[in-house]
Structure formats: structure tokens, C-alpha cells
């Protein structure tokens, strides 16, 4: 089984990939330009991808391809209709960041409501230190 990762550098170096429980070869490319895709996946059974676009033309160059694993939540870079027509399974990381995205959203709401960025800028500019009283009112 031939596995090709087209853009390994889009993941953190600390991210460890699980070793499949079957005989395989893994070829990892740091990045892949669009003109390199067809040649790199020509003999692939499985393609791992994050940001590289896989369109019908690229997929046609990979007759053995049976699975595309997207290392992200979105599949907008994959021609899903072409995959369906060729019997290629596409999987992605579902439920990724289901807690962190809403937490970050609320953190941004609070930061906006309390003018955190404006106060940070004022402190960095020395305005708090120059205030006549201990509290800094703006």
C-alpha cells in the first residue's frame, strides 16, 4: 500500500502520525505545488493532504487511489464529485476544535467588549504609567 503525504509541513513537527496496521510505504513531501501533484500521486493508494488542491485532472493521474485523508475539517480543496465518480473515499477531521473555536470566539467578544487591545496599546505607549492616579481611565 503506497501512502503519499503531499504537504506534511502544514502540520506541526510535533504532530505524530499513527503507523497503519498494514504493510505500507509512506512518502512525505513538505509542500507540493499544483504542477507536481499528478506525478506525486500517480502510484498512490492513499493520499494525505491538508491544503493541496486535488481536482479531477489530478485524480485521473492516480488510477490506484482509493482514499484521500484530509488533515483538516474542510474538504473544499477536493473535487468530491470526481472522487465519488471514481469510488475514492474522502475523510476529514470531523469535530476538530469543537470547543476551542467557540472558546476563542467568546474570548474575542470579551476582548472587544472590554477594549483589551486598546488598553494593551495604551499601556505599551506608557499612558498608564503617566496617569495621575493608580487606575487608568480612558
Segments (PLM) and residue ranges:
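Short beta->alpha connector loops at strand-helix junctions that form conserved
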Residues: 30, 50, 71-72, 88-99
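Short gly/ser/thr-rich secondary-structure transition/capping motifs
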Residues: 26-32, 49-51, 124-135
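Rossmann-fold NAD(P)-binding glycine/threonine-rich loop
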Residues: 76-88
Amino acid at each position: 500500500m503506497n501512502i503519499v503525504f503531499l504537504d506534511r509541513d502544514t502540520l506541526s513537527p510535533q504532530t505524530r502520525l499513527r503507523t497503519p496496521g498494514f504493510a505500507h510505504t509512506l512518502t512525505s513531501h513538505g509542500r507540493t505545488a499544483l504542477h507536481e501533484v499528478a506525478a506525486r500521486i500517480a502510484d498512490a493508494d492513499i493520499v494525505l493532504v491538508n491544503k493541496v488542491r486535488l481536482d479531477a485532472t489530478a485524480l485521473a493521474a492516480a488510477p490506484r487511489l482509493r482514499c484521500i485523508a484530509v488533515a483538516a475539517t474542510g474538504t473544499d480543496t477536493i473535487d468530491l464529485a470526481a472522487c465519488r465518480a471514481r469510488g475514492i473515499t474522502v475523510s476529514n477531521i470531523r469535530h476538530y476544535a469543537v470547543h476551542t473555536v467557540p472558546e476563542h470566539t467568546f474570548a474575542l467578544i470579551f476582548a472587544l467588549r472590554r477594549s483589551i487591545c486598546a488598553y494593551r496599546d495604551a499601556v505599551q505607549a506608557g499612558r498608564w504609567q503617566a496617569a495621575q492616579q493608580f487606575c487608568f481611565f480612558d
